[in-house]
Amino acid sequence: MSFIDIHGHYAWNIDDGIPSYEDARKALELARENRISAIVATPHVTPGVHTKDDIHDFIQRIDDLRMLATEYNIDILDGCELFLNHDYQKALDQNLFIPIENTQYVLVEFDVRKEIGNEQEIEERLYDVQFKGYTPIIAHVERYFKNGLDIERVNGFIESGCIIQVNASSFLGYHGKQAKKIAFQLLDEGLIHVIAADTHRATGSRKPCLNKIFYLLEKNIIIMLFIL
């Protein structure tokens, strides 16, 4: 059995992710040890900041990563993590983002530093992504609810056609107690479509950890079934 990781910042020296070619090698080695067979490279794209030339450079670096990853028998897929900020419409209109491997899926994120915004700030932006013909995959949903999980809100995302992604590292508490609590709540409620590593480093709390999470959650699910 192997994993496909749809969220990873392995393309070095272009965002806050892997800083160097050497670190990319180390991260890919760890990914292989974690039984990851394919990675969607998702550099951060910030509307109003990144230009058409930047997107071109990102794609070129992803190609470099793809070549490197062949040494580890890992497939690399094109993608990005599109920040739906106040300039998001410009990015949508000018195609300043990278859908996952030219499909209708695009990984999107909001500001993790504060409580998730109101419907006009969030749901309207997700709708606009869909109106352009894309399916939003909402990155690390567990990190947006600073004041506690709003299950109805997440259900609304799903009912509108969005995909819910949770970070593997949140189950380990690497994003704080609140994010860990919400990650397990989402799991218990059956509201997670994808668990991804969101790898940013080759060491520390943001390295590949899907294998560890698989066994952790497998154990928890078995315990839940036993109790039931």
What are these regions (language model features)?
Residues 51-160, 164:
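Extended substrate/RNA-proximal surfaces in nucleic-acid metabolism proteins
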Residues 189-208:
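Short acidic/histidine-rich active-site segments
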